[in-house]
């Protein structure tokens, strides 16, 4: 299957606002290719972090998350991945972790309402760089619609960088 990505550029973020005709065009291409879109990565949530101290950025993050889940429903995507960052551009603090958890709980409610699985993508940062750390948040949220989507590449990359630099 294919994966769709909602990157942090305005052009890619605008995908979540597709009209019906644009969605139909994608579905026709998917049908013709015989290759469904099985997952969606919402990496725009690095720029617009769920735990950002700035309330406006958090609001934008939640809009992106909700519209991404709604788009997933329309396109038949089963899993939406969100990055395991409380904040990407800034310092992780008790406050950013609190905001992150609050917003992930809201996302889990949206996912349940829409019938879409959301998975934490494990990342290369200390916040959620292991499945064990991701499990802690999954347990705190306690939703059947929030899971883990481990990305082995994010575990290997730091090791490769060490090897290349030595």
Annotate each language-model stretch with its function:
Residues 31-32, 46-150, 157:
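Active-site acidic/histidine proton-transfer and metal-coordination neighborhood
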Residues 3-31, 84-91:
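Glycine-rich, proline-tolerant flexible connector loops at the mouths of alpha/beta enzymes
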Residues 29, 34, 38-40:
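Conserved alpha-helical segments that form or flank metal/cofactor-binding pockets of metalloenzymes
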Residues 158-166:
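Glycoside hydrolase catalytic-domain groove-lining segments
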Residues 19-20, 136-137, 165-166:
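Glycine-rich, phosphate-binding/catalytic loops in enzymes
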Residues 1, 36, 78:
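Short acidic/polar active-site loop segments enriched in Thr and Asp
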Residues 6, 10, 124, 154:
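Short, glycine/acidic-enriched loop or turn micro-motifs at the edges of active sites
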Residues 43:
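Flexible loop/hinge segments that line or gate small-molecule binding clefts
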